[in-house]
Structure formats: C-alpha cells, structure tokens
Amino acid sequence: MQLIGNAAHFVEIKTFHSYCFDLLGRVGNLDEAGDVVKQAAEMINNGEVEPNRISKTVLVIDEAQDMSKDDYALVSALMKTNEEMRVIAVGDDDQNIYEFRGSNSRYLYELTQTEHSRFIEMTENYRSLRHIVDTANDFARNIRQRIKSTPIISMSQEDGEVRIVKLSLIHISEPTRH
C-alpha cells in the first residue's frame, strides 16, 4: 500500500485462465480450462464483452515466454480494445519449458515487434555464480533464433564450479519463429 497508495485496491492478479473464466461469467475448473482463453479472445474480438469489463490501463505478463497461441490472441484482443493500455511483458526466451503444451517464445518476440514497443534486455544476474553464468552463455550462444543478443553478466564475486557430466541434445528443440 505504501508504494502505490489506494491504487493497490484496483490491482488484479490472475492467470489468463482465471481472467477468462471471470469474463465469461463461469466458475473455472480444470476440465473446462482447455478453450476458455480462446473463447474469451474471440468474444472480445467480436464485441461480445462489455468494454468496462476489459478496460485496463496496464497489463503485466510474467513468464511471457510461456504464452501459447491462445494466450497471445487474448493479449492482442485486449491491446486492440485498449489502445492506451501499457503492456509490460517479462520473459526469458531461454527458459521456455512449456512448449509441449503449446507455449512458444515467438509470442514474446511478436510483442517486441508491435508499434511503440520497447525491448529492454535485463543482463544482470544476481542469483548465479560467475562460472555458471559463463557456461550458460557459452551454451546459449549456439542457439539460433534467440530474442536476446547480449550475454548475461553475473553480479556475484564468487566463481563457483560447473561440472558437465553428460550432455545429450536428442530431445532439445529450438523454437521456431514464423
């Protein structure tokens, strides 16, 4: 409350699924979660949702590298409906671990390509020791189609130790961007 005052009373923190269940006036459950984001995006695009229910001034997306096609369609619909809305998408294309369920870093990339967007690389790592960060940079340098171009810098004064026991790239796939 001290940081933003009474504006804290107007902050909503929800997953895409929870937000869409609310928009559709339904109580969410796992069995019905499959198409709820897609349905909400279509309803917004078709003008079937009251504007006051979708008017937002700021949309913050955490773990934006994990957006799916339907998630991106929802964000796009909200952006089209709320032209003045600020979108802050935070993500790391090297950490997309949900591709098996349809997520793709390309949607984070697409947000960086929209009009008036600004791309900021956060390159300072306060969590990992230097040798760990250096090893990750060496590995990531060989990944094609990355969004980031600047190596990460460890802010730690400690070197740390890295041991690679076995590296198998059989099941690693690179994201595709169309």
Regions found by a protein language model. Give the residues of each.
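Short acidic-hydrophobic, aromatic-tinged amphipathic segments that line or gate anion-handling sites
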Residues: 163-169
